[in-house]
Swiss-Prot record:
Sequence positions that bind NAD(+): 231-236
Listed InterPro entries: Ald_DH/histidinol_DH (IPR016161), Ald_DH_C (IPR016163), Ald_DH_CS_CYS (IPR016160), Ald_DH_CS_GLU (IPR029510), Ald_DH_N (IPR016162), Aldehyde_DH_dom (IPR015590)
MF GO annotations: aldehyde dehydrogenase (NAD+) activity
UniProt protein name: Aldehyde dehydrogenase citD
Family: Belongs to the aldehyde dehydrogenase family.
Entry EC number(s): 1.2.1.3
Organism: Monascus ruber
Catalytic reactions of this protein: an aldehyde + NAD(+) + H2O = a carboxylate + NADH + 2 H(+)
Consequences of knocking out this gene: Leads to complete absence of citrinin production.
Active site annotation, chain numbering: 253, 287
The protein's annotated pathway: Mycotoxin biosynthesis
Amino acid sequence: MAEAAARILEALPAVCEYRWSCKDASKRFTVVNPATGEPITVVQAGNLDTVQGAIQASHRAFESWRWKTRQERSLYLLQAADELQKHSHELAVLLCLENGKPVKDASFDVGFLVQVFRYFGSIVDKLPSEFFDQGSIYSSVIYEPHGVCVGILPFNWPPVHAGGKLAPCLAAGNTMVLKPGEQAPLTLMRIVEILQSVFPADVVQAVPGLGPEIPQALINHPLVKMVSLTGSTASGSQAAQTAAVTLTPTVLELGGKNAFVVFEDADLELVVRDAIDGAFFNKGESCTAASRILVHKDLYPTLVSRLTAAVKKLRTGDGLDETTHIGPVVSRERQQEVLSYIEQGKREGATLAAQGDPPTAGRLSGGFFVPPTLFTDVTADMTIAQREIFGPVVTVGSFETEEEAVKTVNSSQYGLFAGVYSSDFTRAMRVTRKLDVGVVLVNNYFRALLGTPFGGVKDSGYGREHWIGTLREWSRVKNVRFPSGLSPIPAWGGAVDVCKL
């Protein structure tokens, strides 16, 4: 693994310049290895002029891409999946280097990217037509592409988010300009390069940038006809406000403070495994993290004991080390923010039940590590129970009744995921219907189920990704009506009267 990383680093130029990078040296930013704190490379960002160029090129490409048949677009997506598969190891190692996640987790991310292109490539040419017999009128529904679309991506899962936006967008006949997360842009830019070797010119493009300038310019452009953003609730709200000026439709996949509800009759072994997975996978830098565990009071002491023992065994280290469970968070700023939440939890009276041991010596001493942390005796009014921490920190609180559990879950401003664990299926389904979230996982916490709708409610956003309905979100509806010849078409009597000869 170290040899592969060395080859990738050696191949990177000192300054990465892309087609839509500008020449202004002040628009450069450094990409850092979060495991060591050392620079990987410098990226030359774009500016307002290059945004204009990218969108104009995308618009020109749309004029021909939109008329490709669904069968033709299907073949492009399937070919793209094959090409991405060839580069899967390279992409996983690059992602590990710039994001910090364990390379085995990065490999899973790239695998999902490949699968999502295959999924939409396999179904886009098989969607049924819609035809309605209204007596004197026949009516058909045509799903047309929007045009130039924009995808704004975060740093935590570049392959997953890129695939989730690009594949259905292109399958529906749109073109897309992406803006990668500034903390980890290299993997996304490499994915775009690979896709550009498959798709016609300018169908897929990306503009790197630092701060809000590039995304705001992309969203605000009059030629942009749809925007999809994955990020914080604050960034999603700002994007929606900008898009509203031009009445541009948006899909927003935002934050989460996801509850993991455990009743007294739950399978303890399953709960312990899924709780650790849900809380600490991807070092907690996940909108779907099970960061808020709610346990029935009868099971609370036993589960807390098991979770405490498990958290202490989690290994924190370099993602290139295949024995690592939890890598560093993506940046120094994120590290300091997560550590401040841990201190906040202590001040508010939560019990620090367990913490892992981050590396402190050698080349990893400058890394952005946060120890995996378990807080117990957490109440719903505490900051750590309400805020999206976006790091390897999980809280555990108790409840006495089903009604109390539902009320606590629904008190959150977020509404993305929830887990419900009980051997009583009727109760589990009753609770599921009462939870105000977009996705409920019953007796499992498997989040990456391609082919099912992914998305939230409330401050977690709106719109759904990763399923067949996503193709409709990336399309606009045109209704065509024509005479059936079976009976007269109704007409306004006034028109009949005045038009007689």
